[in-house]
Amino acid sequence: VPLVDLPVEELRREVALVTQEHHVFVGTLADNLRLGKEEASDEELLAALDDVGAASWFTALKDGLETELGSGGHTLTPSQAQELALARLVLADPHTLVLDEATSLIDPQAARSVERSLGAVLSGRTVVAIAHRLHTAHDADRVAVVEDGRITELGSHDELLALDGSYAALWRSWRSE
């Protein structure tokens, strides 16, 4: 079904965007998470936080899911806010996801772990990941190299390495660092 033919409400339910800029709303952690799925149980909220690697900071919150966030409440770090946005995504369970540098604020090793967890949780969905970290591209079914606004290479990681073009040069440079 072409996207333009979908009713806006269905489109918003089936397609989700997560960027590197996230908003934490005034309210509890549970309130912020339930923006992804209004009727989610506390167990589902905890599972979503665990799926994105947020357990390390979440378990330290004295009031747990009832911790007040935002103005006058607990302040999340940028990486914690990014994990919160990803947990919302897990709860929303959309068919199609656009991840625009969605783990850029998380340290590279933790980001790798989060991406693997998301891969398992979001299996079977269409994911468009816009990333500058090459390990993200490595795990993709297909990689598009964009230069000056145009796709210059398209294929799997192995196919692009065999082409010995821009992607292969970036990969070799990154691996030698």
Residue map of PLM features:
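Well-ordered beta-strand scaffold positions
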Residues: 1, 38, 72-74
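Receiver (REC) domain active-site loop signature in two-component systems and cognate sites
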Residues: 3, 35, 103
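ABC-family ATPase nucleotide-binding domain "signature/switch" substructure
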Residues: 9-21, 29-32, 46-52, 66-164
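The conserved phosphate-sensing helix
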Residues: 26
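ABC-type ATPase nucleotide-binding domains, specifically the catalytic core motifs of the NBD
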Residues: 34-42
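Conserved H-loop
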Residues: 39, 55-62
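C-terminal boundary and immediately downstream tail of ABC-type ATPase nucleotide-binding domains
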Residues: 54, 162-177
